[in-house]
Structure formats: C-alpha cells, structure tokens
C-alpha cells in the first residue's frame, strides 16, 4: 500500500512541477513574421490554408468506421471458444447490421456521390 501511495504522490508532484515549468519557460512573442505562412522562401500567392471538400471528409469518416468494424470483427473466428459463442455471434451480427443500416442511410442521402 505504501508503494502505491508513493507512486501516486510522485506522479502528482511531477505533473504539477512540469505544468508550472511549462507556463514559466516559454516567452511567447508573436509578430507578423512568425504568423505569416512560409512557402520555400517565396511570398505566398494565395491563402496557405485551402479548404478541402466536405465530401472527402465524409468518405474519410466512413473509411474509419469500416476500418474499426474490421478491427472489431477480426477476432470473431476465435469467438466459438468462449463460454457463450451464440452471444458473440449475436453481438457481431448486431454491429454488422447497425453499420449496414448506416451505410444504406448514407447512400440514400447522397453522401457517397462524389460528383454532383
């Protein structure tokens, strides 16, 4: 018990010291030169931060969701060794059904249409 108390005390103390030092050390002095974009030594012709397509963002979110689905369903073949393999199958089917319904909804709303 003393070891846990010691570790927690050291952790809290170290965190407080590092947070305090991080507020004291930096001398922030933003000027026009630091805030301007840098493009290989040339003056920028336009805005350095161009907006990207919202459709690209939606496709990226869908990719992440289905990538997560694959990661969740990858250990499914070993699910038959659990105590209740039918419960594992029911949960995995529910996850697949929910993601399929979401994909169908996105498709019907036109979210997957790249060109208008």
Swiss-Prot record:
GO MF annotation terms: NADH dehydrogenase (ubiquinone) activity
Heme among keywords: no
Entry EC number(s): 7.1.1.2
Enzyme class: translocase
Catalyzed reactions per annotation: a ubiquinone + NADH + 5 H(+)(in) = a ubiquinol + NAD(+) + 4 H(+)(out)
An example Gene Ontology CC term for this record: NADH dehydrogenase complex
Keyword field contains Ribonucleoprotein: no
Topology within the bilayer: Multi-pass membrane protein
Primary location class: mitochondrion
Biological role: Core subunit of the mitochondrial membrane respiratory chain NADH dehydrogenase (Complex I) that is believed to belong to the minimal assembly required for catalysis. Complex I functions in the transfer of electrons from NADH to the respiratory chain. The immediate electron acceptor for the enzyme is believed to be ubiquinone.
PANTHER family documented for this protein: NADH-UBIQUINONE OXIDOREDUCTASE CHAIN 3
Protein name: NADH-ubiquinone oxidoreductase chain 3
Organism: Oncorhynchus kisutch (Coho salmon)
Lineage: Eukaryota, Metazoa, Chordata, Craniata, Vertebrata
């Amino acid at each position: 018990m003393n070891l846990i108390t010691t570790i927690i005390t050291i952790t809290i103390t170290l965190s407080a010291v590092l947070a305090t030092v991080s507020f004291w050390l930096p001398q922030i002095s933003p000027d026009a030169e630091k805030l301007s974009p840098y493009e290989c030594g040339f003056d920028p012709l336009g805005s350095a931060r161009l907006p990207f397509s919202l459709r690209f963002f939606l496709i990226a979110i869908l990719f992440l969701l289905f990538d997560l689905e694959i990661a969740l369903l990858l250990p499914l073949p070993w699910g038959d060794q659990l105590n209740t393999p039918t419960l594992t199958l029911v949960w995995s089917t529910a996850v697949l059904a929910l993601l399929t319904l979401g994909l169908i909804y996105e498709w019907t709303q036109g979210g997957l249409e790249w060109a208008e």
